[in-house]
Amino acid sequence: MFSQEPPAQGKRDRDCALKITAIDFRWPGNRHFQITIESFNVKRGERLLLLGPSGSGKSTLLSLICGIMTAQEGRIEVLGKDIAAMSAAARDRYRAEHFGIIFQMFNLLPYANALDNVLLPLSLAPARW
């Protein structure tokens, strides 16, 4: 019988696209809404569906992951980068280079299709040129 050793910590971190650790988020002034995630990882290449009823926090969670908002506690790493540790300008650049999101309240180019609207920020990101 063969046993396989778990990958070294560095290898596991490189395989991780998203790592959420001990996140706690509350909207200011709203004690009834809270997102708490103790631990959650998504590997590179893994697909994920975020499904829930209206008001359950899906858009808020995406805003935390892509750095539009920051949590009061915890850590979110995307491709090994701690999102909250970045300045607001650095988060904006990182989001433009690594994310394609259309939220509920969106501004689309009316002459472009959905894919072109999602990909537009990538064409404006310096790292993509």
Residue map of PLM features:
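A short, flexible loop at the N-terminus of ABC-type nucleotide-binding domains that lies
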Residues: 11-17, 25-38, 88
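Conserved ABC transporter NBD signature motif
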Residues: 74-82
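Short coil-to-helix segment of the ABC ATPase nucleotide-binding domain corresponding to the Q-loop/switch region
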Residues: 112-121
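Walker A (P-loop) phosphate-binding loop of ABC-type ATPase nucleotide-binding domains
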Residues: 53-56
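ABC ATPase NBD coupling module
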Residues: 83-100
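Short hydrophobic beta-strand immediately N-terminal to the Walker A/P-loop
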Residues: 48-50, 62
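Short coil-to-helix "N-cap" segments within the ABC nucleotide-binding domain's helical subdomain
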Residues: 89, 116, 125-129
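Helix-to-loop junction immediately C-terminal to a conserved catalytic motif
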Residues: 66
